[in-house]
Amino acid sequence: MKAIEVDVFGLVQGVGFRWFAQRTAQQHNIVGWVSNQTDGSVKIHAQGSQSDLIDFLSVLEKGPGFYSRVDKVITTNIPLFETNDFAIRG
């Protein structure tokens, strides 16, 4: 089990990215949360197996579709945390 913080930059607000991240997390057995940031980025705390996290990130980097654009993804290891779902926050 591993936990990461993911900062996603680009055109990722107002394009369904948080919903896309939640759906993708659920499909890859990832728990945690996603939130819009004031600088226009999206922050994700994600926890799961190493292979599930790799698969999750590879889908996230593509974005939800035509109206979104992912320019940069920064991933940082963080301590494991307690949750059993993947939530959309503010």
UniProtKB/Swiss-Prot annotation:
Its EC number is 3.6.1.7. It comes from Leuconostoc mesenteroides subsp. mesenteroides (strain ATCC 8293 / DSM 20343 / BCRC 11652 / CCM 1803 / JCM 6124 / NCDO 523 / NBRC 100496 / NCIMB 8023 / NCTC 12954 / NRRL B-1118 / 37Y). Keywords: Hydrolase. Residues 3-90 form the Acylphosphatase-like domain. SUPFAM superfamilies: Acylphosphatase/BLUF domain-like. The active site is at R18, N36. It is an enzyme of class 3 (hydrolase). GO terms for molecular function: acylphosphatase activity. PANTHER family: ACYLPHOSPHATASE. This is Acylphosphatase. Gene3D superfamilies: 3.30.70.100. It catalyses: an acyl phosphate + H2O = a carboxylate + phosphate + H(+). It comes from the Bacteria. Belongs to the acylphosphatase family.
